[in-house]
Amino acid sequence: MHPRPSPIAASLYTLRDLDADVIILHGPHGCCFRTGRLLETDGVRVLTTAMSEQDFIFGASDKLTETLRKAYEMFSPKLVGVVGTCASMIIGEDLKEAVQRAGIPARVLAVESHGGFGEGDNTEGAIIVLEAAAEQGIIPEEEAERQIKMLKLATEIEKTRGMAQGKYIRPSYGDDKDEVALRVLEAIMEGRRVAFVLNAKKETSYLFADTLTLPFGSLNPDNPPIIIANLDKGIGLPRIRRHAENILSEIERSGNRVEHITGGLDEYPITGARAAEILRNEEIEFAVVSGVPHALPVEELGLESVAVTDGPRLVEPLRGLGYTHVVAELDAHARTLGQRSIVESDFGDALRRNIKKVI
């Protein structure tokens, strides 16, 4: 009943992950404005055909053809994405025909997405891009199938454990970060078995990995927390692998070490269960789970726990799952787009402040 991410935005992000140089939105100039502006900070040129009221009646394929040609003249792109919107798809615009007429010497992926595509889940927009990319040989068929499987599992998690459960969820900003930070530090100093779990999605991991670089050894040298993370640098598209490699390097430079790798940064729907098994085997008593904490079956573990999420509408579902404490990081996408190194998080700052107080 509340607004949720759009398939159009997911199409844009997935084209970015494929290293598209230019993305053209075939629709009104305000459609997906925020996402388009954010992606510009990540090195992608986002253009629009700026459809108007008259175009809704008579069509705007000529505008798309012209925009494609101008885009090539300005940027000489190797890969261009053309993404449909509600306006262009409702009137039946033929994106592929306009692309053929443009005749630019670049690879062009035409994606007939819109706000209600499929069942309206944002992952539908990502899936249609992956299918088109595999069809054109941009990515292997097996890689597309793997990612589509992950996206479908992610949708299932959101519908059963997250903010897409079909009811109105009141936004909340979670517990006081300083109070929760003190509770984490007390657990380490008391000698309890503590683990930090990164189960994050793509570039948002630059924010959620911040807590993995802190000097916890100064609190209790004989009881450093265990670090578990979905940072396999051999899984995913090249851009996603680079994110994992960058973060692992920074963690190592901080003097900390990732003891357990659960999978890749696009495998968060399944790495939560793997992390839970490690928590059981390591007999962990206190866990801090960051990124997509609702993908980890905390209700099966019987431990004190902290969920660190980026969604105000995920706070209440996470409490319902059994997390002892929940804190929210705002604007994770906006803060991490275009980043190539770890970004300081609000909860990380709370931990830093309180480490200084207790030492």
Swiss-Prot record:
Matching Gene3D superfamilies: Nitrogenase molybdenum iron protein domain (3.40.50.1980)
Obligatory cofactor(s): [4Fe-4S] cluster
Keywords, in A-Z order: ATP-binding, Iron, Iron-sulfur, Ligase, Metal-binding, Methanogenesis, Nucleotide-binding
Catalytic activity: Ni-sirohydrochlorin a,c-diamide + 3 AH2 + ATP + H2O = 15,17(3)-seco-F430-17(3)-acid + 3 A + ADP + phosphate
EC number, as in UniProt: 6.3.3.7
Record's keyword annotation contains Lyase: no
Function, as annotated: Involved in the biosynthesis of the unique nickel-containing tetrapyrrole coenzyme F430, the prosthetic group of methyl-coenzyme M reductase (MCR), which plays a key role in methanogenesis and anaerobic methane oxidation. Catalyzes both the six-electron reduction of the tetrahydroporphyrin ring system and the gamma-lactamization of the c-acetamide side chain of Ni-sirohydrochlorin a,c-diamide to yield 15,17(3)-seco-F430-17(3)-acid (seco-F430), the last intermediate in the biosynthesis of the coenzyme F430.
Description of how the protein assembles with itself and partners: Homodimer or monomer. The Ni-sirohydrochlorin a,c-diamide reductive cyclase complex is composed of a NifH homolog component CfbC and a NifD homolog component CfbD.
Record's protein name: Ni-sirohydrochlorin a,c-diamide reductive cyclase complex, component CfbD
This protein's encoding gene: cfbD
